[in-house]
């Protein structure tokens, strides 16, 4: 599913960009995708869920992508982490849901949306700290199938993200643990969820312009949130507008405008801990530098 390329006021190559149809992404990119950021590069937008964009990044298939921070160790040779546009925050972490309150997950089956996701890394770090015997089988399934699978007893627990925070009780499920809460309590840092990356081959000038343009787009959305509403709701997959607003409020924040010292510390902290657990390759010392 693609949008037509938008012409910018400044001649430049059209950048292929892929991000999710989730409200936080469409809110952030609305002004930029619709040519309302003066001097910004033209974009050719493709919508894809983050598990798809993670794979696209590993194959080098797009100029700019919204990906999970968990995939960075695999792609930073070819892509640079942009200092804005992504999703970090507090109180917005993934949840582990069960049918019964207080269930013991030792040796139990857990459904996850992806094994290359920040949610999964946070889950494994939580499990390493809190389940000495370890969980059992990990089953990867599409995000929208996880809560029904837990409800129907097909799996013992499910790892969920995004708007499931607001809807899991509709399935009669219980929150066993909040991965973000565990992360924040043990590190004091925000939760790194989604990153914007762009090909290093675009060059310093283009990367800097892109980052500036994304930052401008974020501020435009904050200044006039009603302008982005049609774009957000057109791609929100029949989401209730109030849930879309909660989603935006949770995931679009100061770290979206700029990672800052805490944001970079959170990203490096997560990936360093994950590497120590053998979950991802180690990061080089300059891997997160921009541009």
Where on the chain are the PLM-derived regions?
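Pocket-lining segment of extracytoplasmic ligand-binding domains
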Residues: 142-233
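Beta->alpha turn/N-cap motifs
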Residues: 49-51, 57-73, 142-143, 160-165
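Hydrophobic residues within well-ordered alpha-helices
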Residues: 56-58, 150-151, 210, 274
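Bilobed "Venus flytrap"/periplasmic-binding protein-like clamshell domains
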Residues: 12-34, 93-157, 161-163, 265-268
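A local structural motif
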Residues: 36-47, 127-141, 280-285
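Hydrophobic/proline-rich hinge and linker segments of small-molecule sensing/allosteric domains
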Residues: 81-102, 185-201
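Secondary-structure end/capping motifs
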Residues: 203-273
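Conserved C-terminal helix/tail region of periplasmic/extracytoplasmic solute-binding proteins
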Residues: 273-291
């Amino acid at each position: 599913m693609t949008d037509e390329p938008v012409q910018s006021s400044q001649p430049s190559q059209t950048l292929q960009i892929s991000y999710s149809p989730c409200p936080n992404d469409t809110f952030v990119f609305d002004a930029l995708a619709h040519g309302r950021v003066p001097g910004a590069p033209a974009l050719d937008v493709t919508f894809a869920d983050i598990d798809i964009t993670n794979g696209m990044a590993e194959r080098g298939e797009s100029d700019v992508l919204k990906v999970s921070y968990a995939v960075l160790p695999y792609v930073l040779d070819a892509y640079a982490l942009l200092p804005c546009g992504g999703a970090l925050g507090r109180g917005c972490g993934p949840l582990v849901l069960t049918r019964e309150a207080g269930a013991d997950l030792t040796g139990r089956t857990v459904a996850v949306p992806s094994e290359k996701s920040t949610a999964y890394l946070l889950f494994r770090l939580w499990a390493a700290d809190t389940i000495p015997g370890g969980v059992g089988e990990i089953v990867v399934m599409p995000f929208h199938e996880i809560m029904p699978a837990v409800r129907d007893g097909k799996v013992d627990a499910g790892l969920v993200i995004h708007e499931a925070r607001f809807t899991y009780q509709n399935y009669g499920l219980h929150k066993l643990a909040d991965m973000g809460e565990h992360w924040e309590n043990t590190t004091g840092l925000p939760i790194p969820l989604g990153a914007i990356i762009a090909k290093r081959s675009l060059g310093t000038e283009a990367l800097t312009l892109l980052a500036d343009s994304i930052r401008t787009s974020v501020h435009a959305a904050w200044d006039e949130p009603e302008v982005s509403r049609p774009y957000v709701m057109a791609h929100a997959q029949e989401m209730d507008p109030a849930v879309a607003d909660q989603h935006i409020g949770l995931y679009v924040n100061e770290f979206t405008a700029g990672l800052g010292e805490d944001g970079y510390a959170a990203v490096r902290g997560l990936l360093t801990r994950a590497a120590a657990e053998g979950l991802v390759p180690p990061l080089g010392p300059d891997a997160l530098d921009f541009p």
